[in-house]
Regions:
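Glycine-rich phosphate/pyrophosphate-handling loop used in enzymes and phosphotransfer proteins
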Residues: 1-286
Length: 286
């Protein structure tokens, strides 16, 4: 009922920009440009958790974009879903286009957007599942622009987890380790297309790494291919001790995780988010 009422009021009541408060518009041109006006980039946390797939982000998590994501997630600004879905779709396209010889929508068949699941208590408190909602909008935008796509909401939490807010990178990894699983029958669905994990935001990468682990595990069980992801596949230099994310400046080798996803799924696992920390987009502008 709450979600239905919010949808109705979004259509009937006078709107203001959810990013800056400008009157008579759900999203003003300036805030739309902040959300969708950049070329999506590859980003990665520092330090990088083992097993994290290649991640592309559409926008920096700063100012207007932060406000928009929080308005949609926490305040039920559902009228933003379409624009947020467009931004997520752009990040998905960037990841598919960077896949090498099989890059491009035509080489992938159907794209399966797999949302990182929210905790059940969070969905109840918010009255909706924001990431799944944005994934559905992104799939619609991809189809509209010629890429076959659909949402495969096959991940669920297998145990309760603490609120990630306030936890550092190690704490988030420990909190989420082994927390996700693929639903019964979900493995069969994952074999029907090119899997792209989707979330609203990347900070430490713990959520996406755990989602990737769950997807790889079920894919390997179905294919009979088993590989081990070692913590040593992460890389952290002396000048990279803080937690953040940045665009890729050199080719890094992902051994076990990338080979596992490629062998078992038949393609390299990818991930896309709407936003990543600001420095991800400032450290590499070429």
């Amino acid at each position: 009922m709450r979600v239905w009422w919010r949808d109705l009021t979004d259509l009937v009541l006078p709107a203001e920009c959810a990013g800056c408060g400008a009157p008579r518009t759900v999203l003003c041109p300036r805030c739309r440009a902040a959300l969708c006006g950049r070329v999506p980039r590859r980003v990665r946390p520092v330090p990088e958790p083992a097993g994290l797939p290649v991640v592309h982000a559409a926008a920096p998590y700063a100012q207007e974009v932060r406000t928009l994501l929080l308005a949609h997630k926490e305040r039920g600004a559902l009228a933003l879903t379409g624009e947020l879905g467009n931004a997520l779709a752009a990040a998905v396209r960037a990841g598919l286009g960077g896949g090498g010889a099989d890059a491009g929508a035509g080489g992938f068949g159907t794209v399966l957007l797999v949302p990182v699941p929210s905790a059940r208590w969070a969905v109840r408190a918010r009255g909706h599942d924001p990431v799944r909602r944005m994934a559905l909008a992104a799939a619609g935008e991809l189809r509209r622009t010629g890429t076959p796509a659909r949402v495969a909401a096959v991940l669920r939490q297998r145990r309760p987890v603490a609120d990630q807010a306030g936890l550092d990178a190690r704490g988030r990894l420990a909190n989420l380790a082994g927390a996700l699983e693929v639903t019964t029958g979900g493995g069969r669905l994952l074999g029907a297309g090119h899997v792209v994990l989707v979330d609203d935001l990347i900070t430490t990468g713990a959520s996406l790494a755990e989602a990737a682990r769950a997807v790889r595990d079920v894919a390997e069980e179905r294919s009979g291919v088993r590989t081990t992801v070692y913590g040593a596949v992460t890389r952290e230099g002396r000048d990279e001790q803080r937690i953040g994310a940045r665009t890729e400046r050199e080719k890094w080798v992902h051994g076990a995780p990338e080979k596992a996803s490629s062998n078992a799924l038949g393609h390299a696992l990818r991930a896309a988010v709407i936003a990543a920390p600001q420095d991800s987009f400032e450290m590499n502008r070429n």
